[in-house]
């Protein structure tokens, strides 16, 4: 596992964004872990979060023109990632996000920031049902831009209602690559080398066996 992935897991644990235990998800599934990126909510947390996204972007080698953060959770992510790319790698990319409702006065339309053109990298926290991606695709298509890729914090790598995960459905439907800072397999790898979290290894493996893709 790359060092930045290991560091991100430790960071998420330290902020209680990632927890191991027994949790009931909205879907009704019993999960041995829970991930809530909304708890990255201080200036220091967001600055650090942006650095991890920036490292994942550099590791991916993806070529893109504009960062896009879907409202609402993607907005602070796109902003902090744009800053981190400049500070860490001297890569200066424009960023853009959407309003949920279009304004009829002031700065018009439903987009704020850079024009949405060229190859777009969409950044968000997780993909659960893919709804935000589908809504974003309408905006990207309306601006004659192209979705180059999607970057999220965590890929749960689990089945949706069918055999595919929500991420696999997005990749299939839009022909783009979805990549993540960490995925479920990274969590298991982390636990395998951790005395503190070793008690959760069996339940994590069982969950992967039942729901993994």
UniProtKB/Swiss-Prot annotation:
Cofactor names: Mg(2+)
Assembly, per entry: Homodimer.
Residues bound to 5-phospho-alpha-D-ribose 1-diphosphate: 26, 72-73, 99-100, 103, 105, 124-132
PROSITE patterns, per database record: PUR_PYR_PR_TRANSFER
GO biological process: 'de novo' pyrimidine nucleobase biosynthetic process; 'de novo' UMP biosynthetic process; pyrimidine ribonucleoside biosynthetic process
Native organism: Actinobacillus pleuropneumoniae serotype 5b (strain L20)
Full protein name: Orotate phosphoribosyltransferase
Record-linked PANTHER family: OROTATE PHOSPHORIBOSYLTRANSFERASE 1-RELATED (PTHR46683:SF1)
Enzyme class: transferase
């Amino acid at each position: 596992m790359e060092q930045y992935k290991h560091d991100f897991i430790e960071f998420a644990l330290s902020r209680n964004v990632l927890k191991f235990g027994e949790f009931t998800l909205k879907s009704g599934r019993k999960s041995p872990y829970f991930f809530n990126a909304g708890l990255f909510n201080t200036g220091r947390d967001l600055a650090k979060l942006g650095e991890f996204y920036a490292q994942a972007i550099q590791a991916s080698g993806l070529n893109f023109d504009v960062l896009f953060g879907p409202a609402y959770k993607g907005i602070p992510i796109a902003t902090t990632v744009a800053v981190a790319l400049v500070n860490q790698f001297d890569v200066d990319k424009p960023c853009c996000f959407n309003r949920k409702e279009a304004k009829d006065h002031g700065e018009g339309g439903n987009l704020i920031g850079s024009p949405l053109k060229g190859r777009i990298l969409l950044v968000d926290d997780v993909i659960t049902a893919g709804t935000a991606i589908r809504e974003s695709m309408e905006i990207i298509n309306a601006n004659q831009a192209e979705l180059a890729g999607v970057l999220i914090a965590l890929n749960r790598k689990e089945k949706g209602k069918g055999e595919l995960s929500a991420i696999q459905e997005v990749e299939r439907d839009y022909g783009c690559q979805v990549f993540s800072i960490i995925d479920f397999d990274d969590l298991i790898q982390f636990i395998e080398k951790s005395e503190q979290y070793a008690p959760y290894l069996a339940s994590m493996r069982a969950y992967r066996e039942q729901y993994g893709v």
